[in-house]
UniProtKB/Swiss-Prot annotation:
Family recorded in the similarity comment: Belongs to the UPF0232 family.
Native species: Mycolicibacterium paratuberculosis (strain ATCC BAA-968 / K-10) (Mycobacterium paratuberculosis)
Lineage: Bacteria, Bacillati, Actinomycetota, Actinomycetes, Mycobacteriales
Coiled-coil stretches: none
Compositionally skewed regions (Polar residues) per UniProt: 1-11
Family matches, as HAMAP family: UPF0232 (MF_00630)
Region (Disordered): 1-70, 161-181
Composition bias type Basic and acidic residues, residue spans: 18-39
Pfam families: DciA
Biased composition (Low complexity): 40-50
Domain of life: Bacteria
Protein name from the UniProt record: UPF0232 protein MAP_0004
């Protein structure tokens, strides 16, 4: 059988004839659009243009492609995602010794930070009083370490008095007095 033969004896085109006709129509449509009929690409391929600078190798100086320190990457990530306030709060609580110094950190512990108010628990009433007198200097040290506005005020408390309750039934006693702290 040659390609020139007409449809089947019954007068209807065969499946192969329909496929050939569809292929010829597709090739004609591709040629009309200026494409190469065999591959579907443009007849005259244009050379690709590379945007930006050509690839170059790193020189002896610093380059944007050089490995970056992990701390800088973490800081940039926190800044981009809006975590800076939470990171600053965590710095106050996590690096308390570095923020206020060893002597104060040995006698006082931060217990929480909420809405800019840092709660600090001192080991004795004397240390609580001393820290209340140094409150301005402590706020300045904290602001220098983590930035302004993270801690706006301090709530300094002394040690908690022990509980004298010894069971489910309790009679009110005289209270803790001034024995502790």
């Amino acid at each position: 059988m040659s390609d020139d033969q007409s449809p089947s004896p019954s007068g209807e085109p065969t499946a192969m004839d329909l496929v050939r006709r569809t292929l010829e129509e597709a090739r004609a449509a591709a040629r009309a659009q200026g494409k190469d009929a065999g591959r579907g690409r443009a007849a005259a391929p244009t050379p690709r243009r590379v945007a930006g600078q050509r690839r170059s190798w790193s020189g002896p100086g610093p380059d944007a492609r050089d490995p970056q320190p992990l701390g800088r990457l973490a800081r940039d990530l926190a800044r981009k995602r809006g975590w800076s306030a939470q990171v600053a709060e965590g710095t106050v609580l996590g690096n308390w010794t570095a923020v206020v110094g060893h002597q104060i950190a040995d006698h006082a512990v931060p217990t929480g930070l909420r809405d800019g108010v840092l709660s600090v628990s001192a080991e004795s009433t004397a240390w609580a009083t001393q820290l209340r007198m140094m409150q301005a200097q402590l706020l300045a040290k904290i602001a220098a370490a983590v930035g302004n506005g993270v801690v706006t005020s301090l709530k300094i408390t002394g040690p908690a008095a022990p509980s004298w309750r010894k069971g489910p039934r309790h009679i009110a006693g005289r209270g803790p007095r001034d024995t502790y702290g």
